[in-house]
Amino acid sequence: MIANILTIAGSDSGGGAGIQADLKAISATGGYGLSVITALTAQNTVGVDAIYPVAIDFLKAQLESVSRDIRIDAIKVGMLGTPDVTVAVADFLSGFDGPIVVDPVMVAKSGDRLLHADAVAALRDALLPCATLVTPNLPEAADLLGTSEASSKESMTEHAKQVVALG
């Protein structure tokens, strides 16, 4: 049986991240990709030119539509953007019983901020407790923990333990 994997993330017009990259990865590993878009971005390999978050009602409509009709075996969460989107996704995830991978996307590789600073608390407090696996990079882990970035193997290990304790 093919696994149905739902990705909840932003759309990257450059195709190198977000929904587009997730769907490619899901397909390449033999899964069937489903998607719910949290934001539209105008970006390329150089940077992010604009971000347009989807309306909460439309986000909820996407979640309801896909989950009503298709079995979801696992969920991957990426860019959420705003506190409202983060809380709405967390509410949806609280009713899901399968594996949930959360990539707490906060900053693009170009350095552009993708998660509002006021959404970090919602991500940490509402979303991470739903996660089976969280995949922060060093700056994201520091942001989630409200501390400086880990710079040694020991501090990285400590940050990892603290992130695990969040959920």
Question: Could you describe each region identified by the protein language model?
Answer:
Residues 2-7, 23-109, 114:
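Conserved N-terminal subdomain of the carbohydrate kinase-like
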Residues 9-15:
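Short, glycine-rich nucleotide/cofactor-binding loops
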Residues 16, 83, 153:
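Loop/helix-junction capping segments adjacent to catalytic residues or to phosphate/diphosphate-binding pockets
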